[in-house]
Amino acid sequence: MADGVDHIDIYADVEEEFNQESDYPVHDQIDLYDDVISPSANNGDAPEDRDYLDSLPAPGGNEGSKGAPANVVYTYNGKRIALYIGNLTWWTTDEDLTDAIRSIGINDVLEIKFFENRANGQSKGFALVCVGSDSSSRKLMDLLSKRELHGQNPIVTPCNKQSLSQFEMQSRKSTQSGQMSGEGKAGPPGSGSRGGGFPPGKGQRRFPGPPGQGDRFPGPVGPGGPPPHFPGMQGPPRLPSGPPGPLGPPGPPPPGQGLPPPLGGPPNRGDRPPPPVLFPGQFGQPPMGPMPPGPPPPGYGPPPGPPPPQQGPPPPGPFPPRPPGPLGPPLGLAPPPHMQGPPPGGPPPAPHVNPAFFPPPGNNMPSSDGRGPPPGDPYGRPPPYDRDFPGGRDMDASRTPLSEAEFEEIMNRNRAISSSAISRAVSDASAADYGSAIETLVTAISLIKQSKVSADDRCKVLISSLQDCLHGIESKSYGSVAGRRERSRERDHSRSREKSRRHKSRSRDRHEDYYRERSRERDRHRERDRDRERDREREREYRHR
């Protein structure tokens, strides 16, 4: 290597590189540690970010931090204190929580994260709130628990694993209790018995309540419409939305009917439309694209909630209530085939009645006799079902008294059916065709029971005689089957005995043959030995000579 070449000193800048560590402040490490403290949810349920409050204005003391670069997260004096706020309703939004926090004089909220169920996206009832100072955290723990939020007092706890496990356990218990009761969690204000409500102008925008008993068609909802309701979910069913028809003059709701079930679901956030629903394509309708903000699709309602209250005046609304009287179908609209629950215009279900099992008769379905439900049933349920009672047109005919000639004609027909069935069944049973005999008797019994005179004593005598014959043939068929089984068992036993005898005889023969063969082998060996001895003696004699 030439002497003129300059040697490179690779250790020249080592001290400068080590001295660069002093350029980084120590509190950044503390911030990283504080960030690690904020835990995630158990069972893999990380806190789902509802809406990050990026648009919150910074407090007056930190105006100078606006010029910081975008990747700098902590601009509040290097502090980031996390707290848990629980005992919230599942429909509480981050806006509601932010308003409640601001109402107690705290303006340095950095972040709000709601814990949600991964299965349905519903809030678990508690959230992680980060504030920027110790004084704000102390004020939050002291004052927020005294404020009422949707009828419940929030619980503020420090951010640790013990508090997280307590809130998780509380959310699981509430979910299990809601599933056991069959009603889900408590619904939003206006659908439960709690007195917590929304401030004026806010609840009406998010919860469009129908004014009258039959006026269940809400107008256009605000930007945040209620989410769609999938078939099979519990709660008051949603009905087809559309423009209201002529509703008549205003009047009080019908007697016995209180506030109709609210149609609005939980308050949706105003900056997001409801998620698109593509289920109607399964019912012969064209698939729907993403739904714009507005009224929800027909047949969908809120998530599980309690049944509607049965007392109280109707809420104020844009439509006047209907006068009391019979309610007809609304403008020819019929409920879709996949919708469960009462049809449009029917009374709301009672708290103890499941509308899936007790649907009241639809007003848009024509009745067979023009008469309505019995007057004693307030929910319009059909009369109890009687097994021996004919259905359809025979039911109407059975109400009208029969003439003597018709009665005798039907009785003669039943007698002929009974006698022919018994004779044919006996002949089939004698030929050991028990299945055909039993089928004949069962058919005859069902025909006589379906006749118009089945309640008469003479018909009952015919039915009892047919049933006695049926029981006798059944017992005989069972006895014959048992006899066949016994015979088959005896045959199997005899066959098995014969097989065992043959096997024993074969085994004896095999043993005898084996012993014979062994004795022959021994004799052969003895003969060979004797021959060898003789040969040896001869050789000896020959040598001695």
Swiss-Prot record:
Where does it localize?
Nucleus; Nucleus, Nucleoplasm; Nucleus speckle; Cytoplasm
Cellular component aspect of the GO annotation: cytoplasm; interchromatin granule; mRNA cleavage and polyadenylation specificity factor complex; mRNA cleavage factor complex; nuclear speck; nucleoplasm; nucleus; paraspeckles
UniProt feature, compositional bias: Gly residues: 184-200
> Ranges of Polar residues compositional bias?
165-180
**What's the stated role of this polypeptide?**
Component of the cleavage factor Im (CFIm) complex that functions as an activator of the pre-mRNA 3'-end cleavage and polyadenylation processing required for the maturation of pre-mRNA into functional mRNAs. CFIm contributes to the recruitment of multiprotein complexes on specific sequences on the pre-mRNA 3'-end, so called cleavage and polyadenylation signals (pA signals). Most pre-mRNAs contain multiple pA signals, resulting in alternative cleavage and polyadenylation (APA) producing mRNAs with variable 3'-end formation.
Concerning PANTHER family, the annotation shows:
CLEAVAGE AND POLYADENYLATION SPECIFIC FACTOR
Its name, as the record gives it, is Cleavage and polyadenylation specificity factor subunit 6
Provide the species name.
Danio rerio (Zebrafish)
